[in-house]
Amino acid sequence: MSEKPVLGIQDIQNLLPHRYPFLLVDKILSYDLNTRSIVAQKNVTINEPFFVGHFPEAPIMPGVLILEALAQAAGVLLGIILENDRDKKIALFLGIQKAKFRQPVKPGDVLILKAEFSLISAKGGKAIAQAFVGSQIVAEGELSFVLVKKESI
């Protein structure tokens, strides 16, 4: 997928505290503040550090990291929404419900990450998230976040 990003890696790094090797979002393809939704992309390469041990003979992306990538994509949207409070608050991944893994993600895959918030409040939020490779859903779940003061962590 060669869509021009709405937000590039520098923008993402301004919105998320994650850095290599744990930054799992490469670009934001679109977001909509009215529907509270976001679409992001992760290019999965054989150079990912987790492929060294998961699994050398048949590398697949760990499911928990697919969920983390979804949470990071949702976190970017929360960062945009929190624009005025970004210096004071940070969204932390609180939990996941109904997680399902449907297909393996392999080196060379382009992971499309979609999240839509069903709830955003001063205390946190909930989002429905799905990861795709092509038109196939590879993972999905309901993500929960808590908003905390940066000084408290």
Curated annotation (Swiss-Prot):
Which Cys pairs does UniProt list as disulfide-bonded? none
Q: Does the keyword Glycoprotein apply?
A: no
Recorded hits in Pfam families, A to Z, give: FabA
What are the protein's GO molecular function terms? Answer: (3R)-hydroxyacyl-[acyl-carrier-protein] dehydratase activity
Intracellular or extracellular location(s): Cytoplasm
Per the UniProt entry, the Enzyme Commission number(s) are: 4.2.1.59
InterPro entries attached to this UniProt entry = FabA_FabZ (IPR013114), FabZ (IPR010084), HotDog_dom_sf (IPR029069)
- Keyword flag Flavoprotein: no
The protein's matches in Gene3D superfamilies, at most eight in alphabetical order, are given as: Hotdog Thioesterase
Q: Which GO terms describe its cellular component?
A: cytoplasm; membrane
Report the enzyme's class at the first EC level.
lyase
What SUPFAM superfamilies does the database record attribute to this sequence?
Answer: Thioesterase/thiol ester dehydrase-isomerase
Q: So where does this one cross the membrane?
A: none
Active site: which residues? Answer: H54
Q: Which UniProt keywords apply?
A: Cytoplasm, Lipid A biosynthesis, Lipid biosynthesis, Lipid metabolism, Lyase
Name any Gene Ontology BP term. Answer: fatty acid biosynthetic process
Give me the reactions it catalyses.
Answer: a (3R)-hydroxyacyl-[ACP] = a (2E)-enoyl-[ACP] + H2O
PANTHER family named among the record's database cross-references = 3-HYDROXYACYL-[ACYL-CARRIER-PROTEIN] DEHYDRATASE
Give the family this protein belongs to, as stated in its UniProt record.
Belongs to the thioester dehydratase family. FabZ subfamily.
General function of this protein: Involved in unsaturated fatty acids biosynthesis. Catalyzes the dehydration of short chain beta-hydroxyacyl-ACPs and long chain saturated and unsaturated beta-hydroxyacyl-ACPs.
According to UniProt, the name of this protein is 3-hydroxyacyl-[acyl-carrier-protein] dehydratase FabZ
